[in-house]
Amino acid sequence: MSSAIYPSLKGKRVVITGGGSGIGAGLTAGFARQGAEVIFLDIADEDSRALEAELAGSPIPPVYKRCDLMNLEAIKAVFAEIGDVDVLVNNAGNDDRHKLADVTGAYWDERINVNLRHMLFCTQAVAPGMKKRGGGAVINFGSISWHLGLEDLVLYETAKAGIEGMTRALARELGPDDIRVTCVVPGNVKTKRQEKWYTPEGEAQIVAAQCLKGRIVPENVAALVLFLASDDASLCTGHEYWIDAGWR
């Protein structure tokens, strides 16, 4: 698909968490096409190295850095190494299925840490540098799941609901420094991982539930994120922006 070019993104320093596969890979590729300097964080070495090689011909080739976002010291270390940035995309997460009866205290901590906690601490790490650079954009990833009340995802949905609240609070706190904080809420996005799950019948059910009949792919999500990161969205902050084809 073709996409808009945002001159304001050229040369911007962008960090994308979970940028090595799925929606994240689409984000990494999208910012690279804009001429941004992209650093993407992940723990999936094989996928991330493959993406790095695939995008090596970009105006500024993206750089992969391995970082376990569940480790707060690792977050501090990687951002100290990266330095100041203009854009942070908090994309990383994991929607492991579970039943209420199976949830333990340790599993609660793990799910909240992998889906919510790192977003706060990554934002904390970049905010001083963004202030010094005269502003910036933080884009968090929510989920349609808790708006729909999907089953077997209570901790994932709890974390994703929290992200929307955190977005609003951070937008208020960081706004005086011209740091914008927004939240993207994707619908059902067709990634390589999801292609392994869904039968043709399942695909048809997803499309039937949408107002629009197109299937959402990572490039569609990236198009929204690129806009929110650009100067064209200079007065967009504190709210959720949906890309769900009307599935709600």
Curated annotation (Swiss-Prot):
Binding site for NAD(+): 42, 68, 91, 156, 160, 189, 191
Domain of life, source organism: Bacteria
Family matches, as InterPro entries: NAD(P)-bd_dom_sf, SDR_fam
CDD domains hit by this protein: SDR_c
EC numbers on record: 1.1.1.175
Alphabetical keyword list: NAD, Oxidoreductase
pH curve summary: Optimum pH is 9. Remains active over a wide pH range from pH 7 to 10.
Enzyme class: oxidoreductase
Name of a matching Pfam family: adh_short_C2
A molecular function GO annotation: oxidoreductase activity
Active-site residues from the entry: 156
Signal sequence extent: none
Catalytic activity: D-xylose + NAD(+) = D-xylono-1,5-lactone + NADH + H(+)
Function: Involved in the degradation of D-xylose. Catalyzes the initial reaction in the xylose utilization pathway by oxydizing D-xylose into D-xylonolactone. Shows some activity with L-arabinose and D-lyxose, but D-xylose is clearly the best substrate. Has no activity with D-ribose, D-glucose, D-galactose or D-mannose.
Homology family: Belongs to the short-chain dehydrogenases/reductases (SDR) family.
Protein's name according to its UniProt entry: D-xylose 1-dehydrogenase
